[in-house]
Amino acid sequence: MSDTEIQAELVAVARDLNVQRATLRLISDTSVFPIAYEHCEPGTASIRDTPRLDMSKQPVVLKMQAGASQVVEDDCAVATNDPGYHEMREMFGGMKAQTVTANRDADGQIIGLLSVHDLTSPRTWTDAEAARARAAADRLDELTR
């Protein structure tokens, strides 16, 4: 695993998708999907050291655990009524839109989550953008195994 290559992929996907933040969360024995790697565009606050959230109860993670390989949210403000989600959204800088893509092991268990966050405005993600996020997640999976 090369930290430099992982960071380079996060930078590339953030710039390709014109987002302000890209994070890679990896499975851990000590917490539920902590942020292992993060890229923030200039002027964007890091969320790596935000207070720990119970990610196991977050709606996106629950969708992933139910089998979704990717969750695309065009407008995070209306994505769910879950108060914990909106608390997280504000802690994460007022996230306006996001795409989260899962990587799984051979048994189908989630081992990684690539998140890309648009902090500027809601947006309609295109199929090409979702595919770019999937390609980045696949590359990150290769780099972290």
Q: Where are the model-predicted features located?
A:
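Helix-loop-beta substructure at the N-terminus of cytosolic sensory domains
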Residues: 1-38, 46-47, 57-58
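A short, aliphatic-rich beta-strand micro-motif
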Residues: 96-105
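Regulatory sensory and allosteric helical modules in signal-transduction proteins
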Residues: 27, 44-83, 90, 96
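Generic structural marker for isolated residues within well-ordered, non-membrane alpha-helices
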Residues: 10, 85-86
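Sensory beta-strand/linker motifs that couple input domains to effectors
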Residues: 107-118
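Regulatory loop-to-helix N-cap segments in sensory/regulatory domains
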Residues: 118-136, 143-145
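Short clusters of small/polar residues that mark proteolytic maturation junctions
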Residues: 37-39, 75, 115
